[in-house]
Amino acid sequence: MDSKKELIFKKENIGLGKRKQSIARVFLLPGDGKIIINKTSGNKYLQYNDNYLNTVWSPLEKLNLEKQFDIVALVQGGGLTGQAQAIQLGVARLLCTMDKENRSILKPFGFLTRDSRIKERKKYGLRKARKAPQYSKR
């Protein structure tokens, strides 16, 4: 466990996760299972929504490490769903840098896959990206 603690406190050991417009920088610290997002409690930041909290915790739960680490995340941009999923990706990537065996456990669950879907741009002549104004024959 000492070697893992050394890995955690290195400055370059940051898990980076992105989803839609959200970017999350994640740190794992030895602790008892707290979440701190942008210097506030994770429960408060994610508006006490269990879905968001489960999303953030899921990589640690698959490895049975949820009571051994605290998650500290700095998140920018997007909404709460995108931010929670960005934190999840950052946590999963950080766990893989800590121990190479974690990769084979997390990969089948899709925790290491970056969801590349982003908002399509609005085109001129249309109301939204694909919504056209109502067609009138006469």
Curated annotation (Swiss-Prot):
GO terms for biological process: translation. PROSITE patterns: RIBOSOMAL_S9 (PS00360). It comes from the Eukaryota. One of its GO terms (molecular function) is RNA binding. It is found in: Plastid, Chloroplast. Keywords: Chloroplast, Plastid, Ribonucleoprotein, Ribosomal protein. One of its GO terms (cellular component) is chloroplast. Belongs to the universal ribosomal protein uS9 family. This is Small ribosomal subunit protein uS9c. It comes from Phaeodactylum tricornutum (strain CCAP 1055/1). The gene is rps9.
